């Protein structure tokens, strides 16, 4: 079981170190190797996704990533920016399915901006298609027309791309509460009418899963109004980008939220949903729990080790129940700890 570890920038090295400690404590035979991605890779090689990293990532079964980016590199040409490294590895490894859970732990109910009764017990999984849609469609650009500039992008999805993400979503729903909500904008976009048609066709293969449909504007509203109506949601790249960020804030701390990006054989890139937080880098105060929970997703989706994944997730729950908190989730009456102490607490709970 080969894991390519990419600590990345900012708080990335601090939080991945704790996830690696957790994985090593499970007595499984992991081979782990570190490489550069993002700003650190630009500084060392001039390339945000260097060749050595590409080789390592392709040879690994899974990739564990900290975070990339920071204001230090904002003035670089676009192709040299750290974020290009992340887009590059996703494309290189054909990672088309992004899974982002939004779970509200009972101990953190007060962290949400919504009333506790609206979010208590929240457990949503948002599945976003990662490689198609308006982000990658051609033609795109800005041109001169009738004496003014005109910007244009192309929203495009093929039937096979929709089928591929649809199967991932239905199979995920089968393992949960067997409810899938597909989000589109079929009333104005032909591209997403096709999306809905294909989802309905696929649903015949999964008679045990209840499929519903929702327009994206209503879905954005319902996520705030009554989020617990959702179990698994599936949508395209742009809508998924927006809705998964919205759902993450229902929980009150993005420092708690893991994510997985998978290919068609369940090889995956696992990373926290938060950024590189350069303002707190090196201070030992970052929350490592999203990265530790990302490692649990790796155990589940790439290695099929459900029991071990649950062990890690239950250890995180136990640590929260014991009152341990990093600064981002701290409230009066709890025990404020740093990055390594939080890692220690999870190891003790394991």
From Swiss-Prot:
Family to which the UniProt record says this protein belongs: Belongs to the isocitrate and isopropylmalate dehydrogenases family. LeuB type 1 subfamily.
Cofactor notes: Binds 1 Mg(2+) or Mn(2+) ion per subunit.
Reactions accelerated catalytically: (2R,3S)-3-isopropylmalate + NAD(+) = 4-methyl-2-oxopentanoate + CO2 + NADH
Residues the record lists as binding substrate: 90, 100, 128, 217
Residues given in the record as NAD(+) binding sites: 70-83, 275-287
UniProt lineage: Bacteria, Pseudomonadati, Pseudomonadota, Betaproteobacteria, Rhodocyclales
Pfam family, one: Iso_dh
Residues given in the record as Mg(2+) binding sites: 217, 241, 245
GO MF annotations, alphabetized: 3-isopropylmalate dehydrogenase activity; magnesium ion binding; NAD binding
Protein's recorded name: 3-isopropylmalate dehydrogenase 1
Matching InterPro entries: IsoCit/isopropylmalate_DH_CS, IsoPropMal-DH-like_dom, Isopropylmalate_DH
Gene3D superfamilies: Isopropylmalate Dehydrogenase
Site entry (Important for catalysis), positions: 135, 185
Keyword annotations: Amino-acid biosynthesis, Branched-chain amino acid biosynthesis, Cytoplasm, Leucine biosynthesis, Magnesium, Manganese, Metal-binding, NAD, Oxidoreductase
Compartment(s): Cytoplasm
Gene Ontology annotations for the cellular component aspect, listed alphabetically: cytosol
Known role: Catalyzes the oxidation of 3-carboxy-2-hydroxy-4-methylpentanoate (3-isopropylmalate) to 3-carboxy-4-methyl-2-oxopentanoate. The product decarboxylates to 4-methyl-2 oxopentanoate.
Subunit text: Homodimer.
Gene Ontology biological process terms from the UniProt entry: L-leucine biosynthetic process
Name of the gene: leuB1
SUPFAM superfamilies, per database record: Isocitrate/Isopropylmalate dehydrogenase-like (SSF53659)
Primary location group: cytoplasm
Class of enzymatic activity (EC top level): oxidoreductase
Cofactors: Mg(2+); Mn(2+)
EC number of the protein: 1.1.1.85
Pathway stated in the Swiss-Prot or TrEMBL entry: Amino-acid biosynthesis; L-leucine biosynthesis; L-leucine from 3-methyl-2-oxobutanoate: step 3/4
């Amino acid at each position: 079981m080969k894991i390519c570890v990419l600590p990345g920038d900012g708080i990335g090295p601090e939080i991945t170190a704790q996830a690696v400690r957790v994985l090593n404590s499970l007595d499984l035979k992991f081979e782990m190797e570190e490489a550069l991605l993002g700003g650190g890779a630009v500084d060392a090689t001039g390339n945000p996704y260097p060749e050595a990293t590409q080789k390592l990532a392709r040879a690994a079964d899974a990739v564990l990533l900290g975070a990339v980016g920071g204001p230090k590199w904002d003035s670089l040409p676009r192709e040299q920016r750290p974020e290009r490294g992340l887009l590059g590895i996703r494309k290189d490894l054909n990672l088309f399915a992004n899974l982002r859970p939004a779970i509200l732990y009972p101990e953190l109910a007060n962290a949400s901006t919504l009333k506790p009764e609206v979010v208590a017990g929240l457990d949503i999984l948002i599945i976003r298609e990662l490689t198609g849609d308006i982000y990658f469609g051609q033609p795109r650009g800005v041109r001169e027309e009738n004496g003014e500039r005109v910007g244009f992008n192309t929203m495009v999805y093929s039937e096979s791309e929709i089928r591929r993400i649809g199967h991932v979503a239905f199979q995920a729903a089968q393992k949960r509460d067997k409810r899938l909500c597909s989000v589109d904008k079929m009333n104005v976009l032909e591209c997403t009418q096709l999306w809905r048609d294909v989802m309905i066709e696929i649903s015949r293969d999964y008679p045990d899963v209840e499929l519903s449909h929702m327009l994206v504007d209503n879905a954005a509203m319902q996520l705030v109004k009554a989020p617990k109506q959702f179990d698994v949601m599936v949508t395209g790249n742009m809508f998924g980008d927006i809705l998964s960020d919205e759902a993450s804030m229902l929980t009150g701390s993005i420092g708690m939220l893991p994510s997985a990006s998978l290919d068609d054989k369940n090889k995956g890139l696992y990373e926290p949903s938060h950024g590189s937080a350069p303002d707190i880098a090196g201070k030992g105060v970052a929350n490592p729990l999203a990265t530790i929970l990302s490692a649990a997703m790796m155990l589940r989706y790439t290695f099929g080790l459900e029991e071990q994944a649950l062990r890690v997730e239950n250890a995180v729950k136990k640590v929260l129940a014991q009152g341990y908190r990093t600064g981002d989730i701290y409230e009066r009456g709890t025990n404020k700890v740093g990055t390594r102490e939080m890692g220690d607490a999870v190891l003790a709970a394991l």
